[in-house]
């Protein structure tokens, strides 16, 4: 009986490993300022307006609507027409250092405070991401210091 139980465990773990890519997070950015609602209908209660450029995680997608999570964990509904494929991230650290290269000792390009929105340019090796500030400066940020990846 023990070999069968072991086989079942191995098969279960293998199934999880295969399914893991399906669980990838789907991040979007608001293309323009948009009202968000408590239900997928413009007739439902509007909660607040989210600023253009804000990254969100798309959790559920229905016809014309998406349920999204913001960087604080709030779940709201937004019309799909406001979502763009462009990727932005929000700084999670109190003060994040953006460097000229993807290494701790590289020259400091700029610092960004918590909740600053940065454009995501590309992933970099070693747990870094290349980002650009709205003023045009770009550099590398440690991935754990950003939300929206």
Q: What kind of feature is each model-predicted range?
A:
Residues 1-10:
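Bacterial N-terminal signal peptides that target proteins for export
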Residues 21-39, 46-52, 57-117, 121-137, ...:
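SH3-family beta-barrel domains
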């Amino acid at each position: 009986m023990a070999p069968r139980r072991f086989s079942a465990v191995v098969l279960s773990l293998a199934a999880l490993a295969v399914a893991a890519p399906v669980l990838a997070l789907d991040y979007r950015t608001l293309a323009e300022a948009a009202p968000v609602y408590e239900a997928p209908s413009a007739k439902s209660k509007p909660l607040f307006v989210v600023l253009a450029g804000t990254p969100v995680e798309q959790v559920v997608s229905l016809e014309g609507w998406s349920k999204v999570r913001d960087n604080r964990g709030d779940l709201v509904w937004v019309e799909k027409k406001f979502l763009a494929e462009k990727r932005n991230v929000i700084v999670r650290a109190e003060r994040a250092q953006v460097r000229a290269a993807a290494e701790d000792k590289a020259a400091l390009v700029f610092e960004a405070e918590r909740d600053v929105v940065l454009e995501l340019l590309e992933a970099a090796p070693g747990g870094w991401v290349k980002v650009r500030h709205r003023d045009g400066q770009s550099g590398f940020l440690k991935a754990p210091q950003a939300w929206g990846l």
